[in-house]
Amino acid sequence: MKNIVLTGFMCSGKTTIGKMVAKKIGYRFIDTDEYIKNKTKMQISEIFEKYGEEKFREIESQCIKELSDIGGCVIATGGGVVLNAQNMENLKKNGVVFYLSTKPET
């Protein structure tokens, strides 16, 4: 089964909508930021502080690659995932990608 991948700016509703969709269709819900926190045993802000953005993006890309091999998931991505073309290619291999657009006041 293909994944459903949700992208968009911070606070665009990726997690909220992702959880609702996953429950409705019986898919597993995965938030990439939570996945990274569980894998590294560190908060995202802590990774940035200790190692910098470049290292965080490496970890993020590695996690995206892992998640792209799993099927039957609704995946809510961090806002920066779309900045890396390889991340998007990996997500598209086994998923349909949606961009959630919101108004600035949302």
Predicted feature locations:
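Walker A/P-loop
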Residues: 15
